[in-house]
Curated annotation (Swiss-Prot):
GO terms for cellular component: cytoplasm. Binds 1 zinc ion. Keywords: Cytoplasm, Endonuclease, Hydrolase, Metal-binding, Nuclease, Ribosome biogenesis, rRNA processing, Zinc. The keyword rRNA processing applies. This is Endoribonuclease YbeY. Its cofactor is Zn(2+). It comes from the Bacteria. Its EC number is 3.1.-.-. PANTHER family: ENDORIBONUCLEASE YBEY, CHLOROPLASTIC. It is found in: Cytoplasm. Zn(2+) binds at H132, H136, H142. GO terms for molecular function: metalloendopeptidase activity; RNA endonuclease activity; zinc ion binding.
Amino acid sequence: MIYIDNRQDKIKIDEKTLNTLDEIIKYALKEEEVYVNTEVSVILIDNDTIKEINKETRDIDKVTDVLSFPMLDYPKGKTYKEVYKDYEFDASYLDEGELVLGDIVLSLERAEEQSKEFGHSFLREVCYLTIHSVLHLLGYDHMEDDEKAIMRKREEEILNKFSIKR
């Protein structure tokens, strides 16, 4: 189940965009070979709130666009399909029969700022940040150049499937 919870009132987000986020997350999970019932929470917030969370969780006292809180552990350089695709999850991993992949906290305010800065649509920015974060929940990272190239390629492949271009 995908849970999208809009906890801010500074930026309007329409039902079509929310539905696109839901669809794009489900597509990404399928493409990444996540075949079990899953739970992903997407919490939409403002800049002040994400700054607080960033300070509390990462000790970085500044606004960021999106934060990912994965529930599964991955060996360095490995993703869900390499580690967990055929894994038999016991009850400790499940919540009411769903595998909890993690939480995504996204600042719609920052997404709007970045969409203007980068010269593309708000929809594109919100979808990009969401997919970026979903891939983090699935073990992708971008700390090393080779990992970054792989992650960026996956992000663009998923966005292109939905005709979401820069």
